[in-house]
């Protein structure tokens, strides 16, 4: 076999670059004056491009956001009544609510007596009613209303917390210490106007008999008090009806219609009805269902329309 030529023995035998040398060459190439693969002019062009691009993008976003905010009214909801998520029915709610850690619960459970654990519920109700106690009726937006004295336009009716009586007060621990707990029911929906029953003949067949009788007495005694969204609360099942005992409603057996509609008048506070359970049995949980009654309120237990549910247990 012929010997290789002397020059061929040294082809490709030069020293190889190390990884560090290769990296340094990428960062700065002195032969081409490139920094990380680009010349100074190339870096200037791409920097100017992205500055202009992101400036235009931010300006477009700001412009769209400004146009969007022009469509909003921070005092009036865009979707109301039947167009809203909750529909045309007003919402019923109750207080006190269970702790935030039990967000899915509707159970009010406590041990009454001096050594009881009722303090949380009393504190919760005290906090809820604090705005009612601190707000006076001397403001320009407020007026004292009555069944024959509706509010003036642009003003809200003042709800006097003293109407809740002597039993459902923080001084009396809202009845929890004595085993006669109070629960507050509220009814509200923006822009909703109640269509009340003008006579006892208009009430539905499924209205509880005791409320029907009460409305008849009101109609006979003082018909102006018919201007009311009525409220009924009772045990949800036959067994609950037996265990629930007596319920006292204050200040009314419902919500005076002159408090509605709610139109976001500054300082408006929704009216409440205080329920006092006077004869609960120890260790017995009771399912309570409250319903609101008016011509334009639909009631459906499955969808919780026109009603609110909670449980109460005293130990």
From Swiss-Prot:
One of its GO terms (cellular component) is sodium:potassium-exchanging ATPase complex. Keywords: Cell membrane, Disulfide bond, Glycoprotein, Ion transport, Membrane, Potassium, Potassium transport, Signal-anchor, Sodium, Sodium transport, Sodium/potassium transport, Transmembrane, Transmembrane helix, Transport. One of its GO terms (molecular function) is ATPase activator activity. InterPro entries: Na/K_ATPase_sub_beta (IPR000402), Na/K_ATPase_sub_beta_sf (IPR038702). Disulfide bonds join 145-157, 168-182, 233-290. It is a single-pass type II membrane protein. This is the non-catalytic component of the active enzyme, which catalyzes the hydrolysis of ATP coupled with the exchange of Na(+) and K(+) ions across the plasma membrane. The beta subunit regulates, through assembly of alpha/beta heterodimers, the number of sodium pumps transported to the plasma membrane. The sodium/potassium-transporting ATPase is composed of a catalytic alpha subunit, an auxiliary non-catalytic beta subunit and an additional regulatory subunit. This is Sodium/potassium-transporting ATPase subunit beta.
